[in-house]
Amino acid sequence: MYFLNSRTVPEFAMRATRISAEMAKCSLAHDTFITYRPLEKLELLEYFPFIKHVDAERTTDWEHPVFSETGTCLECIPDGWQKPWFIETMLMSLKSVIQEDGMAMKDIYMTGAKEKYGSLRMDFVTPVTKDHAFSDMCLAWEELAGYFCCQCGKPHVSISRGWICPYCKDCWDDINGEFKEIPVESVSITTWENDEKIKRTIDLVPLYETVEKIWEETCVY
């Protein structure tokens, strides 16, 4: 997502650090989305309705069985990014933005999610608004995924050549080349506001440290 506003970086960190209590309310499986039993998936969709897979070009009928049965778009992303310490933290921070900005949860829905060039790409349909906090947070998480192993979800990664993807040192065995950990950096973007070209930078370190701390505390594999 690339529609950004002038929100400050510390807000990302503050929003992310408030999610631990909320996470406890959601009975999510301790593995990947792919292994959910039907009841668990329905619970997940109820708690995070904005991840329900809806084809925006065809229909927005949330009650149609084809959508309630097929689930979400998130089954298409690498297993490592579906681990609880990453995916649950991401979804709670996105939900927090939606709630704090007063948007209706039913008006936001996902149309696609995938790995691309070693980072996450998510497509959402959202209401037109002057405040792009949701898009800001989406961009931060899309870029942050590139600092967690696409295979197991651990932090501290190197980037493979050929098919570009992040791998931790433990998963590097099948990859040719020397393991060189990449430092977490800011993401620079250029946007247009009121016909004026504006360059902005989002610091990913606060979010990275939040997810890394949760990983260290849970270490679910």
How should these model regions be labeled?
Residues 173-187:
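Short metal-binding segments enriched for Cys and/or His
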Residues 114, 136-147, 158-162:
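Short, flexible, mixed-charge glycine/proline-rich loop motifs
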Residues 149-152, 168:
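Short cysteine-rich clusters marking metal-coordination/redox-active sites
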Residues 155-159, 173-176:
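Short functional micro-motifs and their immediate structural scaffolds
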Residues 162-174:
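Cysteine-rich micro-motifs
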Residues 1-133, 202, 210-221:
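Long, charged N-terminal interaction/targeting segments
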Residues 186-192, 201:
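Acidic, low-complexity, intrinsically disordered interaction modules
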Residues 112-118, 159-162, 192-196:
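Short, ordered beta-strand-loop transition motifs
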